[in-house]
């Protein structure tokens, strides 16, 4: 079921690759590209590297139609499925297989050295990813095999927490914090704080009355209009002489002396006739 869910992804595509028939390896020293007929390739076409699951596939296809010429499954790299030659970095030996299980070794080569580098790196990156996935899967299995740690409370189990400024078990409230630094405190008033005013001097008398000036008489002759004007003018009001105020009733003393020393100012005569 897991194999059916796996999808095929393309790792590398190179449009130009040459295929060579190689002679059998005479010793264990490795393959040499100089032993091949490099100027007469047996087949040319396109190379495509795909992956499905953990296995990579090197596919040799026709450039125009895309028909599959040969395929080399790779399950490990470096390994027997893909080998490098000893005398060049642009040529490799791959093991191709058909559907019946038969296999053969052929040589492939790239004209551009950069294409050979991409071919090599694509296989390395794929199997590096396969290795990381295997390690992650192994670690997860080990974690599942370990006994799980039970951190829950058992039945009847209690714990005690100590938190500041909270009423304790005996019911006593926590002590209030005292203010430290920076605060201003108001002092209470002194006991018996009554303001006493000293009595004023008995020799000072206050006169709050100002005598109005006499009304000047008219300089005109004794005409009838003057007589009428004199009749219309108000009669002078006689005011009694000011009586001195006793020193016991004076509460401000020296302030009254300043008010009594102000000279009386006579009002200016008015030219308006009062009716």
UniProtKB/Swiss-Prot annotation:
Its main location: membrane. Belongs to the NECAP family. It holds the Pfam family DUF1681. GO terms for biological process: endocytosis; protein transport. One of its GO terms (cellular component) is plasma membrane. The modification Omega-N-methylarginine is found at residue 180. It is found in: Cytoplasmic vesicle, Clathrin-coated vesicle membrane; Cell membrane. This is Adaptin ear-binding coat-associated protein 1. Keywords: Cell membrane, Cytoplasmic vesicle, Endocytosis, Membrane, Methylation, Phosphoprotein, Protein transport, Repeat, Transport. The gene is NECAP1. It comes from Pongo abelii (Sumatran orangutan). Involved in endocytosis. Residues 256-275 have a biased composition (Polar residues). A motif (WXXF motif 1) lies at residues 252-255. Gene3D superfamilies: Pleckstrin-homology domain (PH domain)/Phosphotyrosine-binding domain (PTB). Residues 166-191, 211-275 are annotated as: Disordered. It comes from the Eukaryota. Interacts with AP1G1 and AP2A1 components of the adapter protein complexes AP-1 and AP-2. Interacts with the GAE domain proteins GGA1, GGA2 and GGA3. A motif (WXXF motif 2) lies at residues 272-275. The WXXF motifs mediate binding of accessory proteins to the ear-domain of AP-1, GGAs and AP-2 through hydrophobic interactions. Selective binding to the GAE domains of AP-1 or to the alpha-ear domain of AP-2 is tuned by the acidic context surrounding the motif and the properties of the second residue of the motif itself. The WXXF motif 1, which is preceded by an acidic residue and has a glycine in second position mediates specific interaction with AP-1. The WXXF motif 2, which is followed by the C-terminal carboxyl group negative charge, allows specific interaction with AP-2.
């Amino acid at each position: 079921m897991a194999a059916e869910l796996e999808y095929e992804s393309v790792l590398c595509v190179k449009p130009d690759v040459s295929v060579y028939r190689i002679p059998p390896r005479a010793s264990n020293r490795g393959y040499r590209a100089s032993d091949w007929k490099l100027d007469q390739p047996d087949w040319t076409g396109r190379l495509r590297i795909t992956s499905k699951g953990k296995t990579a596939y090197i596919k040799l296809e026709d450039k125009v139609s895309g028909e599959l010429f040969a395929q080399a499954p790779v399950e490990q790299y470096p390994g027997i499925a893909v080998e490098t030659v000893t005398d060049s970095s642009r040529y490799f030996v791959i093991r191709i297989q058909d559907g019946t299980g038969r296999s053969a070794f052929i040589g492939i080569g790239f004209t551009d050295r950069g294409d050979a580098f991409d071919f090599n790196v694509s296989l390395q990156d794929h199997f590096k990813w396969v290795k990381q996935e295997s390690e992650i899967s192994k670690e997860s299995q080990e974690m599942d095999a370990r006994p799980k740690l039970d951190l829950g409370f058992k039945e009847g189990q209690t714990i005690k927490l100590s938190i500041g400024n909270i009423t304790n078990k005996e019911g006593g409230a926590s002590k209030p914090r005292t203010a430290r630094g920076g605060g201003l405190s108001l002092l209470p008033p002194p006991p018996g704080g009554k303001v006493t005013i000293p009595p004023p001097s008995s020799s000072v008398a206050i006169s709050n009355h100002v005598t109005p000036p006499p009304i000047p008489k008219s300089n005109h002759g004794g005409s009838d209009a003057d007589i009428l004007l004199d009749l219309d003018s108000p009669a002078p009001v006689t005011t009694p002489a000011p009586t001195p105020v006793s020193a016991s009733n004076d509460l401000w003393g020296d302030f009254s002396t300043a008010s009594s020393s102000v000279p009386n100012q006579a009002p200016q005569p008015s030219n308006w006739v009062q009716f």
